[in-house]
Amino acid sequence: MINQIDIKTRERMEACIQTFHNNINNIKTGRASPTLLHNIYIEYFGSKTPLRQVSNIIVEDSHTLKINVFDDSITSLIRKSILNSNLDLNPVLQGKDIIIPIPRLTEERRKQLIKVIRGDAESSRIQIRNIRRDANDKVKRLLKDKIISEDNEHTSQSKIQIMTNEYIKKIDCILEKKEKELMKF
């Protein structure tokens, strides 16, 4: 029973880390990366299709992305989707390809982005702590129902705390890496 709580807690904490990682990966650092466009979808044959399924996204240089579109008829749809994506990108049609220059970040914008990612990191830490609280409550309920002993309760809560510290440390590492990436350029 306790093992199931530990496994479920680890899964939930891992999902929280993954969500945080995905969120900050979508933040532009002033450097070209295909992941910038991973959340772009276009209407293709009546359904929303990810951009990466209808094209190749290539990094031309550190400040330019190039999109090789498989079907010429959707080039303008892709351009429109990128313009409407709130990514502040200005795609340029060049034959059947789309060129996307990535603007350099100003110092002020970098500081704003760092505040945003620090806020996301704190929200993720709070989620991890809430997951810990939920797990500890389940363990206490098992003790109250006399399914486990007090020793098992203390051992389980120690494991949960170690797990919590581990995942908060992961959040801090991801945050530190992203801050360095933002300040590099």
UniProtKB/Swiss-Prot annotation:
Recorded GO CC terms: cytosol
Pfam families linked: RRF (PF01765)
Tree of life domain: Bacteria
Keywords, ordered alphabetically: Cytoplasm, Protein biosynthesis
Protein location: Cytoplasm
PANTHER family xrefs: MITOCHONDRIAL RIBOSOME RECYCLING FACTOR PSEUDO 1, RIBOSOME RECYCLING FACTOR
Known function: Responsible for the release of ribosomes from messenger RNA at the termination of protein biosynthesis. May increase the efficiency of translation by recycling ribosomes from one round of translation to another.
Protein name stated in the entry: Ribosome-recycling factor
Organism: Buchnera aphidicola subsp. Acyrthosiphon pisum (strain Tuc7)
